[in-house]
């Protein structure tokens, strides 16, 4: 594999602006500061406040990032050595089986080494109680925040950055004015997997991926295309299969068609759902194709923990704990007001058990289970019946 890329991304920080005040909330909501105090303090004091007014105040407070908790305001007066962790995933990755859990291991270890405590904002997950993106206004309880998840809200993150709040996203991002980030070199790693397949003799390779514009997905596809192009292999639309619903669209019939057309190797991306990988495995099994006897198979990432019983797929491993630690170092530097950056982290090739040279002839998937035998069917056209007449 080539040397890991050296694209870096850091962001200096200026002094953090003052936190929004109740007076600002009042101006935005079009009410008095007394009303704001009563609503946010959850005390009516005998005053009759309509639900419409209350919603205006709450909405204005959230849009400004106002934190009404007095304890939070005391924490804001100075650095408090707290780093927040937001996870925009279906569940917060505290389960050891979660693909993001190793990130948290690296985050925790490096935070301890840097002298920081962690605040886990579980409300950022859809299953939490904080309302997803709206939970980000609570990030100001900490000195800075780490963000996990392929689909973190761009507008909300850019707003925090514009206000001078230190934010680091775990994973490459494309927005010039977005948060600082740390990431793995998926381009080089994916290109290296294709190079290994080409060295084994494969000339028709298909990438299976989700229909997603996340940088981690586009980087993997770029690496695959670079590997194919350097080998002089087809890089057109037929080289990549994108699907918004792999479990439904990636069928055994489609896999059989690819193999009949000369495809000898498949590559799938890893995501937090592993949808493409799971669908590809299911389709190959249903088609009766063995790996690596009939086709070779590679995974651009680590296999999901709940699929550890089968053969180890070839591909690459992502240094998740190392990335988590790098994210904390970068965030700590930004909190301190320093210019900082972290290089892309190289992935490690995993030989696995699913690669082999292609068969000299395309494998013939088994026919469906036969039904009742019908005379004259299922024979070669050139054979003859017992009466000596050709079959139709």
Annotate the PLM regions.
Residues 1-79, 362, 369, 373-391:
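N-terminal helix-turn-helix DNA-binding module of bacterial transcription factors
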Residues 51, 55, 63-134:
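Amphipathic helical "hinge" segments at domain boundaries
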Residues 90-102, 120-129, 182-192, 208-254, ...:
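Hinge/beta->alpha junction and helix N-cap segments in small-molecule ligand-binding domains
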Residues 148-188, 301-313:
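Flexible loop/hinge segments that line or gate small-molecule binding clefts
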Residues 252-392:
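Flexible loop/turn connectors
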């Amino acid at each position: 594999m080539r040397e890991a890329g050296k694209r870096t991304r850091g962001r200096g920080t200026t002094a953090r602006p003052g936190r929004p005040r109740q007076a600002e909330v009042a101006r935005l909501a079009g009410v008095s500061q007394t009303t704001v105090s009563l609503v946010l303090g959850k005390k009516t004091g005998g005053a009759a406040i309509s639900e419409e007014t209350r919603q205006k105040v709450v909405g204005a407070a959230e849009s400004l990032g106002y934190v009404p908790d007095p304890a939070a305001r005391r924490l804001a007066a100075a650095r408090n050595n707290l780093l927040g962790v937001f996870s925009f995933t279906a569940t917060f990755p505290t389960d050891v089986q979660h693909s993001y859990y190793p990130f948290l291991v690296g985050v925790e270890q490096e935070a301890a080494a840097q002298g920081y405590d962690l605040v886990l904002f579980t409300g950022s997950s859809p299953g939490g109680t904080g309302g997803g993106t709206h939970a980000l206004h609570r990030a100001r309880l900490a000195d800075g925040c780490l963000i996990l998840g392929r689909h973190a809200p761009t507008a909300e993150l850019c707003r925090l950055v514009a206000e001078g709040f230190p934010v680091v996203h775990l994973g490459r991002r494309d927005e010039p004015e977005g948060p600082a980030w740390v990431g793995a070199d998926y381009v080089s790693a994916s290109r290296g997997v294709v190079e290994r397949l080409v060295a084994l003799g494969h000339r028709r390779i298909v990438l299976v991926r989700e229909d997603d514009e996340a940088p981690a997905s586009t980087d993997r596809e770029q690496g695959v295309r670079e590997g194919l192009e350097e080998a002089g292999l087809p890089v057109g639309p037929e080289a990549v299969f994108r699907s918004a619903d792999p479990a439904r669209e990636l069928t055994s019939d489609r896999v059989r068609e690819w193999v009949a057309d000369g495809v000898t190797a498949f590559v799938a991306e890893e995501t937090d759902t592993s949808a493409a990988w799971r669908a590809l495995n299911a389709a190959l099994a249903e088609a009766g194709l063995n790996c690596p006897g009939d086709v070779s198979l590679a995974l651009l990432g680590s296999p999901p923990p709940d699929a550890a019983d089968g053969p180890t797929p070839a591909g690459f491993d992502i240094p998740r704990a190392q990335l988590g630690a790098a994210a904390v170092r970068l965030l700590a530097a930004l909190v301190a007001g320093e210019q900082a950056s972290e290089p892309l982290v190289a992935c490690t090739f995993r030989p696995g058990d699913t690669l082999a040279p292609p068969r000299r002839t395309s494998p013939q998937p088994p026919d469906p289970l036969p039904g009742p035998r019908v005379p004259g069917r299922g024979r070669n056209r050139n054979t003859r019946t017992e009466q000596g007449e050709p079959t139709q």
